[in-house]
């Protein structure tokens, strides 16, 4: 089966079912005649921007939605998976991350500077990232975008 067709089937399954595990998704794919390895399924999940959401003690797969965010989908996944909190202070944004992930996020944000003139630079520690923005307004917008992503 071609990849595009498989991706369409995965979209349909995730949209219409509460899937908790990759094994469950793999089983539903098999019921539809789609045999896929766990590694391929993981790549497909990443490609489709599918994330695990938590609600009332349950976790299930859902699509990452960006709204009007200027943050690209790869960076959204980094934010969703690694960020604990974000707060703006003047033209700065202080982002708390999981331990060891601040520098990964800083590199990803630095890569965005060509397309985002509102981000001037970053400084990362082990679990804290400081983003220097062009203005207080830019810092507030970036913080709002991050918080929107974290809410899922």
Curated annotation (Swiss-Prot):
HAMAP family: Arg_repressor. This is Arginine repressor. It comes from Lactococcus lactis subsp. lactis (strain IL1403) (Streptococcus lactis). Pathway: Amino-acid biosynthesis; L-arginine biosynthesis [regulation]. Gene3D superfamilies: 3.30.1360.40, Winged helix-like DNA-binding domain superfamily/Winged helix DNA-binding domain. It comes from the Bacteria. It is found in: Cytoplasm. Its main location: cytoplasm. Regulates arginine biosynthesis genes. Belongs to the ArgR family. One of its GO terms (cellular component) is cytoplasm. SUPFAM superfamilies: C-terminal domain of arginine repressor (SSF55252), Winged helix' DNA-binding domain (SSF46785). GO terms for biological process: L-arginine biosynthetic process; protein complex oligomerization; regulation of arginine biosynthetic process. PANTHER family: ARGININE REPRESSOR. Keywords: Amino-acid biosynthesis, Arginine biosynthesis, Cytoplasm, DNA-binding, Repressor, Transcription, Transcription regulation.
């Amino acid at each position: 089966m071609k990849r595009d067709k498989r991706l369409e089937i995965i979209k349909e399954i995730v949209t219409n079912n509460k899937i908790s595990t990759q094994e469950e998704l793999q089983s539903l794919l098999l019921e539809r005649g789609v045999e896929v390895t766990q590694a391929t399924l993981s790549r497909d999940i990443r490609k489709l921007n599918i994330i695990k959401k938590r609600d009332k003690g349950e976790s299930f797969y859902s699509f990452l939605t960006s709204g009007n965010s200027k943050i690209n989908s790869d960076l959204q996944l980094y934010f969703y998976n690694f960020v604990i909190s974000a707060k703006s202070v003047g033209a700065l944004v202080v982002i708390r991350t999981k331990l060891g992930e601040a520098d990964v996020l800083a590199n990803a944000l630095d890569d965005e500077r060509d397309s985002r003139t509102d981000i001037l630079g970053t400084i990362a520690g082990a679990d804290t990232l400081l983003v220097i923005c062009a203005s207080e307004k830019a810092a507030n917008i970036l913080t709002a975008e991050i918080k929107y992503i974290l809410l899922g």
